[in-house]
Amino acid sequence: MIRGRIMRKFLILSMLIFTTLCGCVDFSSSNSNGYYHDSWSYNNYTSFVDTHEHYYGKVVKVVDGDTVYVEVNGELWKIRLLGVDTPEIHKRNNPYEYYLLNGTPITDTKYLKEWGYKAKHFAEKELKNKTVIIVFDNEAPKKDKYGRYLAYIFINNSNNLINFNEELLKYGYARVYISNFELKDEFLNVEREAKENRVGLWNWSNN
């Protein structure tokens, strides 16, 4: 009996210690801008959007996986999704732009083009004829040399803001396009995880 009471007390004490330790763990993450979010794409981006120049518009045309036309206040904006690059479908792909985690380039240009079309179909499914939020980055230029707007596109899914640029990386439709923008480190982390898990186009093998 005495031994049983001691064991029960030990179990209760262990549970209390575990609960206390769990309460001390911070399961959220923060970047240098101070807004908090969970890992991966389903982040709470509300603070990010609110503190950046943004507009609402309707996607009327998808050119390819990373370029869309959005109607904003009666104007038609051509938007190049910031920080990501999907394989080309209108011209030949560069076989030395997409590298696996081990440093091997995806040299099969036919394979890359196939994934370019898959990226376009994904963008059409998720964006076409939908109202989105166009968000400009504080570190990146507003337009590129071709006159296209450089921006993030956010989707409001059940009051949860989803960064579509990041979704392309998460599902292996795109690589990170290296330039100066605020979410670069996060995008690189998402890309790395997709490569580690051989998601999407990263499942290529040259065997």
UniProtKB/Swiss-Prot annotation:
Gene3D superfamilies: 2.40.50.90. Disulfide bonds: none annotated. The keyword Hydrolase applies. The active site is at 80, 88, 148. This is Uncharacterized protein MJ1439. Belongs to the thermonuclease family. PANTHER family: EBNA2 BINDING PROTEIN P100, SERINE_THREONINE-PROTEIN KINASE 31. Pfam families: SNase. GO terms for molecular function: endonuclease activity; nucleic acid binding. Keywords: Endonuclease, Hydrolase, Nuclease. The keyword RNA-binding does not apply.
